[in-house]
């Protein structure tokens, strides 16, 4: 059963790799809120800098986490997923538990010791603590705005009557 | 699990980063695998959030190999005043 799942996922991952080359195809699938690639494991190659350079740019926001957005397998990863959900961000997620070479690869890439790791516009932003702090300070809304993502929280804020904005 | 406790981590951060305020909480019920920290030091002045966290991570590089989960809130003294005021 597991093997079947893996081979299915592998296929979707390879399709995705094709997407990167084709670039424009992602625009035709707006119904998918967040894309998730569990089958990084299938490649079996060591994840080097060149590969990660590409991976972190497959979407405006890319998250390396434990588990997947539907079922995070770590409290810190879950916190990042919930923050992204609140802001209504569409992002690509990679499960490092599926692939030890990705887990180590991304840590080496950023020189950052822990998972989750969040990238915006290809730039490493931080882990859970930093995302949480950016969320609380409002900086996350600004960072998202820079890459053309309008946070759902900002939309909600703007829809509010003037007297409630002070909160 | 790990040989570290909050006191050890506080002392190390105080010494290495010249903290004005530091508070480390053991959230692992004593097994030493999970900590959260509030760190306030002028060493953070002029640094971005990411740089602050990197500074703490590198200070505790050796310890973090054994500590499973470490959560930090890192502020400059100025930022800390604002946080306290809230």
Where are these regions (language model features)?
Chain B
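Short secondary-structure junctions
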Residues: 13-22, 64-67
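C-terminal structural segments of small proteins and small subunits
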Residues: 58-86
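Solvent-exposed beta-strand sheet faces enriched in polar/charged residues
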Residues: 25, 38-40, 73-75
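N-terminal presequence-like segments and adjacent domain-start helices
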Residues: 1-4
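Short edge beta-strands and adjacent turn/loop segments
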Residues: 19-36
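A generic structural micro-feature
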Residues: 29-31, 49, 64
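A short interface-forming secondary-structure element
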Residues: 38-51
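Short, non-transmembrane amphipathic alpha-helical segments
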Residues: 9, 13, 49-62
């Amino acid at each position: 059963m597991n093997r079947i799942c893996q081979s299915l996922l592998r296929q979707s991952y390879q399709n995705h790799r094709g997407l990167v080359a084709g670039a424009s195809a992602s625009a035709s699938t707006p119904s998918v809120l967040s894309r998730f690639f569990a089958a990084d494991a299938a490649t079996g190659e060591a994840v080097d800098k060149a590969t990660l350079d590409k991976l972190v740019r497959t979407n405006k926001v890319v998250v390396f986490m434990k588990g997947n957005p539907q079922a995070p397998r770590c409290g810190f990863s879950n916190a990042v997923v919930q923050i992204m959900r609140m802001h209504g961000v569409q992002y690509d997620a990679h499960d490092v538990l599926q692939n030890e070479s990705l887990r180590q690869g991304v840590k080496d890439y950023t020189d950052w010791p822990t998972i989750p790791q969040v990238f915006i516009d290809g730039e490493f932003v931080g882990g859970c603590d930093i995302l949480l702090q950016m969320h609380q300070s409002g900086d996350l809304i600004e960072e998202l705005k820079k890459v053309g993502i309008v946070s759902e929280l900002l939309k909600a804020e703007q829809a509010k009557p003037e007297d409630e904005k002070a909160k | 699990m790990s040989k570290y406790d909050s006191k050890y981590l506080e002392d190390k951060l105080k010494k290495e980063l010249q903290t004005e305020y530091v508070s480390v909480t053991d959230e692992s019920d004593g097994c030493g695998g999970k900590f959260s920290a509030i760190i306030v030091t002028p060493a953070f002045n002029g640094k971005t959030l990411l740089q602050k966290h990197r500074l703490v991570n590198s200070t505790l590089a050796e310890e973090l190999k054994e500590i499973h989960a470490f959560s930090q809130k890192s502020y400059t003294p100025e930022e800390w005043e604002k946080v306290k005021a809230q």
